[in-house]
């Protein structure tokens, strides 16, 4: 996540003591939210003096780069990005690396649904899987669908996961897999959108589609079916209450002192506009917009 070359010399005198360029990097789950808000913020104001009369007349540049939660934290730690985006809890070691100016901004709550293709005949047999069965499926210990339910065909179970740099991989490992490793035959996906699309295109697929990605995939037609986990459904109410346990925060962090311009954009993220974008992307807002 390196800063783009263009606009670096834009109003250089003003940039000596004013930050006109802001860079976010990391989680592909948070990426569409921040990217959408960066675009609307830039289109609305164009130059920083339109945001605040005390700011200089320099062009607004808010760059957002996907790369995964781990990449985002690293970029925030080494200073190649102002903010690292995560879709998991931040580790104590990462907080320590970010230093005394560490700050976290939680934008949304997300959960990992255990989703199968909506055409899978399993959906007619049961709407729930227990954690141990899920673990065995993802570990490859249960390899065909007839091992889940004897009435199903002996088709190979195709497992879909996020790539290893994604926050979801760590969340699922901690919440479900424990000491077990995900099967090496699992197909890795570069984003939650891709993961959901992969399951939707495979009648014998299963994967941990994020709540937001699941809702977006099913917006026009139900293509995914989320299994209850130990009888608990991944609903907004159950995620907020914590009853549905396979969940994660969606947030961004920094180790820098937040500049006035960055704070102005953060205020925009946590406004009604930001709230609406979070909802549009299928997530549960973790904030109440300022009046």
Spans of model-derived segments:
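Exported/periplasmic ABC-transporter solute-binding proteins
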Residues: 2-97, 102-291
């Amino acid at each position: 996540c390196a800063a783009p070359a263009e606009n670096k010399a834009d109003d250089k005198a003003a940039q000596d003591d004013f930050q006109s360029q802001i860079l976010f990097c990391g989680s592909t789950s948070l990426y569409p939210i921040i990217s959408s808000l960066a675009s609307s913020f830039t289109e609305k104001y164009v130059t920083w003096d339109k945001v605040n009369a005390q700011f200089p007349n320099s062009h607004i540049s808010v760059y957002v780069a996907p790369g995964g939660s781990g990449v985002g934290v690293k970029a925030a730690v080494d200073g190649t990005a102002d903010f690292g985006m995560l879709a998991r809890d931040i580790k104590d070691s990462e907080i320590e690396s970010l230093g005394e100016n560490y700050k976290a901004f939680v934008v949304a709550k997300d959960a990992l649904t255990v989703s199968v293709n909506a055409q899978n005949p399993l959906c007619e047999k049961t709407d729930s899987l227990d954690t141990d069965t899920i673990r065995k499926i993802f570990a490859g210990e249960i390899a065909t669908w007839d091992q889940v339910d004897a009435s199903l065909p002996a088709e190979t179970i195709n497992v879909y996961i996020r790539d290893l740099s994604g926050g979801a991989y760590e969340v699922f490992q901690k919440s479900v897999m424990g000491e077990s490793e995900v099967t090496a035959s699992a197909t890795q996906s570069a984003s939650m959108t891709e993961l959901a699309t992969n399951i939707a295109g495979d009648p014998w697929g299963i994967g941990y589609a994020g709540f937001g990605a699941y809702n977006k995939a099913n917006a026009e037609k139900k293509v995914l079916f989320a299994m209850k986990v130990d009888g608990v459904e991944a609903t907004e109410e159950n995620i907020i209450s914590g009853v549905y346990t396979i969940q994660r925060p969606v947030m961004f962090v920094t180790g820098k002192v937040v500049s006035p311009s960055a704070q102005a954009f953060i205020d925009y993220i946590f406004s009604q506009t930001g709230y609406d974008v979070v909802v549009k992307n299928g997530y549960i807002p973790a904030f109440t917009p300022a009046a």
